[in-house]
């Protein structure tokens, strides 16, 4: 069983960038929450303090970029994209 960090259980906060990408990439908050619920792993992102979460959606691999906000105990979701798409 995968060990998740403490911030994994924090409430989600969505960035304005994510909200735009949800529309562009045709996925919903429910889709995103499902991706995170069934995520298979995580690794540090190139941006300090951020993490890349590996997930699946519509039978494709996706990456969800998150940033824990310890002071607020929130997990800020920065963006989400299919792994074969460029990150914008």
Segments from the language model and where they lie:
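Ribonuclease/tRNase effector modules and their secretory precursors
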Residues: 1-88
